Structures are given as C-alpha cells and as structure tokens.
C-alpha cells in the first residue's frame, strides 16, 4: 500500500489518505526496496530462505508495479557474510529468481575498519559473486 500512498495521483483509499494527511500531490518515490536483510537468521524478524524470499519478492514487485510501473526495485542481497560463503548462493538465487524485476541488488557488507586497501579488498571480495 505504500506505493499507492506515496505515488498514486488520487481517487484510491491510500492516495486520498495522503491528501487528507496534508500532501495532495504524489511524493514520487522512485526507488523501493523489496525487504531488508531478509536472510538475517536469527536476528531478522520474518527471515526467509532464498527461495521463499524470491517468491514473496516476485509477488510484491508485481503488486507495486501495478500501482506505478515507473518505479525501480531493489532486491535484498545477503547480509550474512560468514566464512562458508553461503551468501554467494543467496545472491545468485535472488538474481536468478527476480533479476528481471529488480534494477539493483542491495549488498550489506559491513567493514570493520583498517587501511583503505583492506576496505577495497573486503568489498571487492563480494564483487566476485557477479562475475
């Protein structure tokens, strides 16, 4: 409903609610995230495996684009970067499953500091997933 509230012109429940709340014109939000750190077991409420996330994200993308087909969507990349490299599989499955629906993939790598070279090496290791 957020896309309708933020972007639909008028004449629907949520676009009219936006106007009633003091903003008659659409906000025009163009980039929307299809979840945040969805692979975050156990810390993320509502976490999913990649297959379940892809299914839910495809349905959400369809509904969101039906309201505003000009928006760009961001897929939830992995946030769980542990030594086994299972996150590579998450990102690949998401790209294979909803790559046709998203413009971006949100990668959540958290650098713990150090030299600029260590930053580029750390971040660059994630790029190999897209080779």
PLM regions: where:
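Active-site groove signature of glycoside hydrolases
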Residues: 6, 12-49, 74, 103-114
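Secretory-pathway/luminal and periplasmic proteins that interact with or process carbohydrate-rich
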Residues: 11-12, 84
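Noncatalytic carbohydrate-binding groove/subsite architecture in carbohydrate-active enzymes
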Residues: 49-131
């Amino acid at each position: 409903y957020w896309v309708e509230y933020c972007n639909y012109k008028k004449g629907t429940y949520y676009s009219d609610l936006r106007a009633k709340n003091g903003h008659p014109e659409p906000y025009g939000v163009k980039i929307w995230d299809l979840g945040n750190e969805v692979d975050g077991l156990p810390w993320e409420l509502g976490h999913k495996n990649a297959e379940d996330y892809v299914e839910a994200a495809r349905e959400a993308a369809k509904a969101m684009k039906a309201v505003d087909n000009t928006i760009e969507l961001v897929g939830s990349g992995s946030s769980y970067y542990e030594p086994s490299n299972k996150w590579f599989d998450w990102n690949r499955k998401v790209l294979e499953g909803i790559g046709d629906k998203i413009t971006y993939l949100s990668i959540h790598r958290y650098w713990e500091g150090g030299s600029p070279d260590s930053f580029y090496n750390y971040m660059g290791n994630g790029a190999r997933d897209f080779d």
